[in-house]
Amino acid sequence: MEKTVSEAISLRRSVRLYKDESIDSEKVKQCLVNASLAPTSSNLQLWEFYHITDKDTLGRMAEACLGQNAAKTAQQIVVVVSRKDLWQKRAKANLNFLDQTYDKEGLSDRELRQKKMASDYYSKLIPTIYTDFLGILGFLKYVTFQIVGLFRPIYRQTRLSDMRIVAHKSAGLAAQNFMISMAAIGYDTCPMEGS
């Protein structure tokens, strides 16, 4: 029986030694779907999940994880990768979604303003924040956004290092959704970090 969210959160622990029992890949895939529903900064979802079930690949992953028991004994491994480079693709997907959502006759003034504001966000602000040539523009953007921020609310994390941190935090939120979902169906997990 699937647990409630509160039960799953209370139950979830990092398990570092797994029994030699198979787990249902379809259930793991559903947990990955749940992971994709995690909140992310600007709805950009700057991460990818790789679900590894092949025994040879699992063996290579265990080596890459420095022989940790959690990796050596896992029946399946899910790798979460931050992908800051996907911002253009994800922003375009959000713009397409906006176009489809607001593609109807007789939009109210409020709906037209909402569409314009969201479209400007993904077509103007996001490219301004994520575009940087060798980190040179980061300082200029940082100073500009700090000054503008004195007069109105504005996004202030605009340097390359800020964007990397945003991507990692979003990936962490998605990974947490995945681990809680796994706990809810009675499967144990163990987060391991690496670069």
Regions found by a protein language model. Name each.
Residues 1-195:
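Acidic, surface-exposed loops and disordered segments
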